[in-house]
UniProtKB/Swiss-Prot annotation:
Catalytic EC class: hydrolase
GO cellular component, one term: extracellular region
Catalytic residues (UniProt): 103 (nucleophile), 433, 484, 493
Subcellular location as annotated: Secreted
Signal peptide (from-to): 1-22
Official protein name in the record: Endoglucanase 14
Residues bearing attached sugar chains per UniProt: 76, 192, 215
Classification of source organism: Eukaryota, Viridiplantae, Streptophyta, Embryophyta, Tracheophyta
GO biological process terms held by the UniProt record: cell wall organization; cellulose catabolic process
Length: 512
């Protein structure tokens, strides 16, 4: 059944668009959006295409209550034990959203960043997505995440409170169960005025502002504005308020998220003074960064604001432009082979940008999106090239060619001759570190898989019974070697953060 489903996706892309290596970007684009349907939590919609998944986590938030919106939100507790209907009559709904990778926790920090990266793909390349027949699926993917984030804010009472996580990483990782009938704790965690999380509040503001720009939703924009104010007024890292998150998605600071959120709000509001003033007054615009990631958004903020071209050409804006250009130059200037560009990345012998042994592909796709949009910015601005140090320069065409090389590597033009996008091509990872994919579908095998019994499937050493099509695994090591083992979570686990930017990149590489 699954192979047939994948075949249908490929057939649906009626015009095959292949590059010099024979890669079909249209099919890869379709699969990348299919992946998000495989990551859905909550009650699945009638149009759900990934049929081996089923409804899951339908009681998320049900054990929580918050004060009625007519009353001031509590800033002290997240679980209401009172029975007074006037003070505690709103049951929390935290269903929906995405599982971030191969486990069953809903981590708000990477989920919000995923929504922002997906929205950026739509904002930049919506016309190309539409021409490929995938704009509707892309907007559905954005909306599924944005709707959850909106509920996480509204269910917390709105204003200065936000639910930021459902589930506990330690208890989840002690079990190997499919999401449809997991029995691990579904604890919900909140930040508020007394237990702040300015980083995650600002990131959620960025997600909703970017989604508002992609979906033209005034409701999303209102929540984004409220969350930005919350973030500015109550500074503090969210993992200090929610220690359960610290081991998995700890934050290194909040200034990048605040600048990133201000940039998206500036765009979504058409340049409202509040956000341009915040940007102009920012004392830390990041310098030259080593990467763009779920924890470090300075590069994204710099790119967004340079793309606008409407801010003053001096002060912090000029600094951001210089920093962004140096980041890009560091990536594309190499001494060949194993030579290192600056900025913390180097090229593997096979030509892959390489930062880290754990899910390196997330950095590859995010950096590639920045390069793609900047190349288009140079073209639109009629700039002949990007000037790098030592008199070197890179034309928009050269930047785009570099992006293409990274995408082609992911799709199979690499020393392993393996596609790191699951389901694409004739050879791709068979043992993905992903609970739902590795366990029998509840539809074909409804018998419960116990917490510890599931580890038999983790350790089985056989192909996944369900192909999580469109997922991009963590990828090979610095020498282009990949170990296709489900236990190899550093290389074999996919994430929504990795796939979100490639949606835009693949759309960009399609002919206009």
């Amino acid at each position: 059944m699954l192979a047939a489903a994948i075949e249908l996706v490929v057939i649906a892309t009626s015009c095959m668009v292949r590059d010099a290596h024979g890669h079909d970007y249209r099919a890869a684009l379709a699969m990348s959006l299919l992946y998000f349907e495989g990551q859905r939590s909550g009650r699945l919609p009638p149009a759900q295409r990934v049929q081996w998944r089923a409804d899951s986590a339908l009681a998320d938030g049900a054990d929580h209550r918050v004060p009625d919106l007519a009353s001031p939100p509590s800033s002290n507790v997240s679980v209401c034990a009172r029975t007074d209907a006037m003070q505690c009559d709103m049951q929390v709904d935290l269903t929906g959203g995405y599982y971030d990778s191969g486990d069953n926790v809903k981590f708000g920090f990477p989920m919000a960043f995923t929504v922002a990266a997906l929205s950026w793909s739509v904002v930049e390349y919506g016309d190309r997505l539409d021409a490929a027949g995938e704009l509707g699926h892309a907007l559905d993917a954005v909306r599924w995440g944005a709707d959850y984030l909106t509920r996480a804010h509204a269910s917390a009472g709105g204003g200065e409170a936000l639910y930021v996580q459902v589930g506990d990483g330690d208890s989840d990782h002690s079990c190997w169960q499919r999401p449809e009938n997991m029995d691990t704790p579904r604890t919900a965690y909140m930040v508020n005025a007394s237990s702040p999380g300015s980083d995650i509040a600002a990131e959620t503001a960025a997600a909703l502002a970017s989604a508002a720009d992609a979906n033209f939703s005034s409701t999303l924009l209102l929540h984004a504005k409220q969350l930005f104010e919350f973030a500015k007024n109550h500074r503090g890292l969210y993992h200090n308020s929610v220690p359960s998150a610290a081991k998995f998605y700890a934050s290194s600071g909040d200034e990048d998220e605040l600048l990133w959120a201000a940039a998206w709000l500036y765009i979504a509001t058409g340049g409202e003074e509040e956000y341009s003033a915040y940007i102009a007054g920012a004392t830390n615009v990041g310098g030259v960064r080593s990467m763009f990631s779920w924890d470090d958004k300075f590069v994204g903020a710099q790119a967004l604001l340079v793309l606008q071209g409407k801010l003053p050409a001096d002060g912090s804006h000029a600094e951001m432009k210089t920093n962004l250009e140096q980041f890009i130059c560091n990536l594309v200037q190499h001494s060949g082979g194993n030579g290192g560009g600056g900025g913390g990345a180097r090229l593997s012998p096979g030509g892959m940008l390489w930062w880290d042994s754990w899910n390196n592909m997330q950095y590859v796709t995010l950096a590639s999106l920045v390069l793609a949009v900047h190349a288009d910015h140079l073209t639109a601005a009629r700039s002949a090239s990007l000037q790098c140090g030592g008199g070197a320069s890179r034309s928009p065409a050269q930047l785009t060619a570099f992006v293409r090389s990274q995408v082609d590597y992911i799709l199979g033009s690499n020393p392993e001759t393996m596609s790191y996008m699951v389901g694409y091509g004739s050879r791709y990872p068979a043992e993905v570190h992903h609970r739902a994919a590795s366990l029998p579908s509840i539809k074909s095998s409804p018998a419960k898989v116990t917490c510890k019994g599931g580890f038999d499937y983790l350790n089985k050493g056989s192909p996944d019974p369900n192909v999580i099509a469109g997922a991009i695994v963590g990828g090979p090591d610095a020498d282009d070697r990949y170990d296709d083992s489900r236990q190899n979570f550093r290389q074999a686990e996919p994430s929504t953060v990795t796939v979100a930017p490639i949606v835009g990149i693949l759309a960009r590489l399609l002919p206009s």
